[in-house]
Amino acid sequence: MTGTDTRNWRGVAAEDKDELPEQVSFLLRARSRRLLADLLRPYRREIILLVAVIVVCNAATLAIPYLVKVGIDAGIPPMTSGEGPGTLVTVVVAVLAAAAIQAATRQVFLGKTGRIGQDILLELRRRVFAHFQRLSLSFHDGYTSGRVVSRLTSDIEAISEMLESGFDGLVTAVLTLVGTAVLLLFLNVKLGLAALLPLPFLLLFTGWFRRQSSITYRRTRETVALVIVHFVESMTGIRAVQAFRREPRNQEIFSRLNADYRDANVRGAHLIALFTPGVKLIGNVTVAAILLYGGWLAIGGEVTIGVLAAFLLYLRQFYEPMQEISQFYNTFQSAGAALEKLSGVLEERPAVPEPRDPVPLERPHGRVRFEAVEFSYLDGTPVLPRMDLTIPAGQSVALVGTTGAGKTTLAKLVARFYDPVAGRVLLDGVDLRDLGERSLRTAVVLVTQENFLFAGSIADNVRFGRPDATTAEVVEAVRAVGAHDFVSALPEGYETQVGKHGGRLSAGQRQLVAFARAFLADPAVLILDEATSSLDVPGERLVQRAMRTILADRTALIIAHRLSTVEIADRVLVMDGGRIVEDGPPDRLIEGAGRFAGLHRAWLDSISDLPNVPE
């Protein structure tokens, strides 16, 4: 991967890099700015109004030192000469009015920016979540769930901090700096130029801080993502962790990642610890120098005491915003690194895109055809060298073969989780790439060996593919797969909560609920990918009758290492190395001397010692 070929850095390719080529860093920052501008665009009018509000707020703030100058120079002398406090009272009232305007406009500004910031975060979360769901399995195969969680939590939180307080501080600081500089020169050019003399050094110091913090906060976002990734994966696989006594090793890994995250934050804190006191030091030295120089000018009669007092107040206002800017850099660099990652995710495109003009499939029949299909995964190794296959509508086909033979890949192509590298996969004569997502997911349903259940009731999980299904339809589907008895025996029946990942149910019960879910969806093509692998032999036999009901009048692809499941199929395809080496009805293949016959004999030998289970 070369640093100058920017095509290699699209999407999430730069996520794990601490330091990037300057050209790539520029492109990532530009991509992040485009995302931020896109999020801010709907609020253009509100932002313009808020800029006007903050201008008024800063004008009121800047007016107070000038009013102090007027009070000292024009309000106090008349009182000492016996003319009364009229001028001073007027100035005091003006100061109070300016303070009231400052408070009111500040309240409006903070209230509106808080609401706009939350609306933007709402849209960003929605957009990122929706995009993650649209991305193809090929992306999720290499992008861990921990990284997904990190994008939607810590990265969003970093952007939230910038929107809620960062922009407020930046806008206020910039307006204060510009306004103060103008007023310093207006009050006295000599003192003004002297006060602004350290500004070039301050800008150089700030530029150095920006460059260093950019690297540091990118590293911070990467390390916190790794901490979240390890935590999520460890908790998701907690049963395996405890079963293999991996707790000490996992703790060691987590401690190392956690230490890396701490070190990255410490480096950021060191930068802030250097920059913020440095700005204060420059500001205080400038105040001392102006006090000395201004006092000398005042003795010479070139400036009044009021002007000198206003100068000192303005200088405090002038250098305080530099500290605000330093804090904004802290927030912005963290948010900028988060924006880089989120914009990278949003730049990813599904490997299985939606067609521009989808072909409607009103009543799918389930005829599947592979025409010269070739397929390989990301490493380029052919999984299906060439596949020509026709499956008539309503036929159940069992795919048999050793691990890595290509069975699951073939099924995933039918479900269009992937697109072939060459050739076409057709459903009822229509290329799957021309079908809309809704039509395809209605026509083809996959039941996997993971039998994933979502938190909720059994009825909710059965309705997953058809949320509008009635209770009667849910019960009918559960009866069809032979699960009604066990569901009814549960304390809360169909309203029983399955727990996280269905953990309150046994593996066999989870599989039966997954079968019921598929049956209720009523697809034209049903794919069972190792769908009975979680059942023991007696349980598997009990489900055979229900399986025949499920497969009736629909096309089915059955992938199983257990050949008892294959016996209910109309046709068997034996695969090896991505090719079909045997094809025929199961009875005929069993009687032959091929691979399927050998597998069948081995299966009979493996269950010869098991007790009989009544049909």
What are these regions (language model features)?
Residues 21-29, 52-53, 60-73, 98-145, ...:
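Juxtamembrane helix-loop junctions of ABC transporter transmembrane domains
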Residues 47-105, 185-190, 288, 301-305:
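Transmembrane helix-loop-helix hairpins at lipid-water interfaces of multipass membrane proteins
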Residues 44-45, 137-138, 154-163, 167, ...:
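An intracellular "coupling" helix at the cytosolic face of ABC transporter transmembrane type-1 domains
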